[in-house]
Regions:
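Conserved SAM-binding strand-loop segment of SAM-dependent methyltransferases
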Residues: 40-52
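Short, flexible coil/linker elements and helix-boundary hinge sites characteristic
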Residues: 5-8, 39-42, 65-66
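Conserved beta-strand positions in the Rossmann-like core of class I SAM-dependent methyltransferases
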Residues: 16
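A general structural signal for alpha-helical elements within enzymatic catalytic domains
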Residues: 5-6, 33-37, 145
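Short, conserved SAM-binding/catalytic segment
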Residues: 28-43
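Signature of N6-adenine DNA methyltransferases within the class I
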Residues: 1, 10-12, 20-26, 50-194
């Protein structure tokens, strides 16, 4: 928000949140209310309490029921769930173009977020590093890197300190990518131990 407040062309900030975990809904609402009160620009928000993947299946697959002009965003920020799904899970079936075998929900979120971006829109995601190699993620990598240009990567070297209160034991990264076919000459890479 601080950066958006500095841009004179931005008159209004429109935030859409997808969250279907009732355990965090009260905290999310409090944070959105705080943001609304403490920003220099007009901020409007909407919380969609639905499945992020399944709510957009028709648009993603361009079916007969798809919206002719689905909503696209300038910025998408994501901290998706790290859950392995069965290969016949509804989310996996909805995004077969990026799935090979039993997918992890986090990369389906990333693929859907790339779909949700306007041209030159940017996304920032915190995810496991595992998507960067191996045959299991090849379809996702090919589609994602065909549509998006990585701009910055931050690696957490610790496997257990990124989410101290959770049982996530993976190498984790934050990446920033832009929806464009222009590739940057350099990608900024940084690391931290914790």
């Amino acid at each position: 928000l601080d950066e958006l407040n500095k841009i004179s062309e931005v008159q209004e900030i429109d935030v859409t949140c997808y969250e279907n975990n009732q355990d965090v809904m009260e905290l999310l609402q409090a944070n959105l209310d705080w943001m609304q009160k403490h920003t220099a620009k007009k901020l409007v928000y909407k919380v969609r309490q639905e499945n992020y993947i399944l709510s957009q299946t028709e648009n993603y697959n361009k079916t007969f029921c798809a919206e002719p002009d689905p909503r696209k965003y300038d910025i998408v920020i994501g901290n998706p769930p790290y859950i392995k799904l069965p290969k016949d899970a509804p989310e996996a079936m909805a995004m077969q173009d990026v799935c090979y075998g039993a997918p992890n929900l986090y990369f389906l979120f990333a693929a859907m977020s790339a779909f949700d971006l306007k041209e030159n829109g940017e996304m920032v995601y915190i995810v496991p590093r595992s998507w960067t190699s191996g045959a299991y993620f090849k379809r996702f990598r090919n589609k994602f890197l065909g549509e998006m240009a990585l701009q910055q990567i931050h690696l957490f070297e610790s496997r257990d300190m990124v989410f101290e209160t959770e049982s996530v034991l993976q190498e984790t990264m934050i990446f920033k990518a832009k929806r464009t076919n222009k590739r940057p000459e350099d990608i900024l890479m940084t690391t931290t131990q914790n």
